[in-house]
Amino acid sequence: MDFNSLRKEIINNNASVKELVNDFFDKIKHKDPEINSYICTTKDNAIEQAENIDKLIQNKEKLPPLAGIPIAIKDNICTKGVATTCASKMLKSFVPPYESTASSKLWSSGGICLGKTNLDEFAMGSSTETSLFGVTSNPWDINRVPGGSSGGSAASVAAGFCAAAIGSDTGGSIRQPASFCGVVGLKPTYGRVSRWGLVAFASSLDQIGPITNTVSDAAEILYSISGKDPFDSTCLDKPVPNYLNDLNKSINGLKIGIIKECFEHPGLNQEVKESVLSGVDRFKALGAEIIEVECPRFNDGIATYYVIAPSEASANLARYDGVKYGYRSKEGSNLVDMTSKSRAKGFGDEVQRRILIGTYALSAGYSDAYYKKAQKVRTLIRKDFDNAFKKVDVLLTPTCPTTAFLKGDYVNDPLSMYLSDLLTVPVNLAGLPAISIPCGFDTKGLPIGLQLIGNVLEEGKILNAANIFEIDAQVIKNRPLF
């Protein structure tokens, strides 16, 4: 249910906010065991929040912009007094003493927290199969993955277990699951949204963003959570426009660049390619000018990312030693031995794999060959985007090379898993905003996503184009039945 539908229910007195929130919890209780999108729910707090909104309505007071909207939070984003586990044994018992800036802004705007959603451990993955709390299923086909690492957030929105969810995107972790689950996923410009309270994976790449049913809902969430934050030095001190204002503006004459290298990649599924190209035709019919552009180093993004991201993860995760917090092994003959055993048992296989890759890439004698070289390629990728944006307003690619794959297909094949982020990681390396919207289905009935990429701080352009496409295409007429 999108925001406007919920508001109509409330305004027309068809239901109180408390009743609507209880309906969501009933659905979660009876249906989520099949999906496993939530790690925990926060019913008592949600009911209290709902009652406060109901009082405002009864007293005919001015309502905050997200009043009564039920929202789920990815479990790598800190929530005061509510466990934030990162789906890891290492943080299974960690309860933050503070609220993240992004979630705090949501609650100040009237949003209601339903709970914390499942993810790949420490947000390292593309399938939500590495969680301590079990695998999440795709609502369109429960034998398939929802994508990752924000798979729980995307699945909860697609199944109707919340009206919106917040995720994090380091290399595609909002957009890829949004594509797999047939919902909207927005990764903002790096620094547009504060990372204060987001458990760090790769600090130069991580960004918080919304997963929603509609583009307009994503625009509302982005407006609420954006803006300067004194607790995050990388957060941009730039004006935040109301993204709703230009959502319905005509895209006649909008220059959309089709990245040649993406559509020529041998790993791109033919059905995905055809569906996205049909989307290109729709944009053309809506008045956009279609221009083919080249980004010669676009396909180098995946190799570059898997040097930089693990390197930063290696440094960030060094803090988890079982001394001050986190899992502590009861074994160990001394401090070093205890720390080693705590990390070996506290982290899962994929997290350990990435720590090892990153440590190697940063090690003496190898950092020049790997990490520093990857940073140089990152600069070249950014320059390719800069050159493309001299010719066009927005760039367009498929979100993912394939539709949702079966559980177990890639979990023991890291290379294939990493390649599922082929079309999303260059955006993070360049710090650009991008949105995934549904554009069709394959012959198995699985959703296909189309990605629009904007220049720095030009979320308004991609939201406008995505909204016009969404209204015209009406791709998602019915959600999975849950």
From Swiss-Prot:
Record-linked InterPro entries: Amidase, Amidase_CS, Amidase_dom, AS_sf, GatA
Pfam families according to UniProt: Amidase
Active site positions: K74, S149, S173
Record EC number: 6.3.5.7
Catalysed reactions listed for this entry: L-glutamyl-tRNA(Gln) + L-glutamine + ATP + H2O = L-glutaminyl-tRNA(Gln) + L-glutamate + ADP + phosphate + H(+)
Keywords in alphabetical order: ATP-binding, Ligase, Nucleotide-binding, Protein biosynthesis
Biological process according to GO: translation
MF terms in GO: ATP binding; glutaminyl-tRNA synthase (glutamine-hydrolyzing) activity
Gene Ontology cellular component list: glutamyl-tRNA(Gln) amidotransferase complex
UniProt xrefs under NCBIfam families: gatA
Family: Belongs to the amidase family. GatA subfamily.
Protein function: Allows the formation of correctly charged Gln-tRNA(Gln) through the transamidation of misacylated Glu-tRNA(Gln) in organisms which lack glutaminyl-tRNA synthetase. The reaction takes place in the presence of glutamine and ATP through an activated gamma-phospho-Glu-tRNA(Gln).
Subunit: Heterotrimer of A, B and C subunits.
PANTHER family assigned: GLUTAMYL-TRNA(GLN) AMIDOTRANSFERASE SUBUNIT A, TRANSAMIDASE
Name assigned to this protein: Glutamyl-tRNA(Gln) amidotransferase subunit A
Lineage: Bacteria, Bacillati, Cyanobacteriota, Cyanophyceae, Synechococcales
Gene, per the UniProt record: gatA
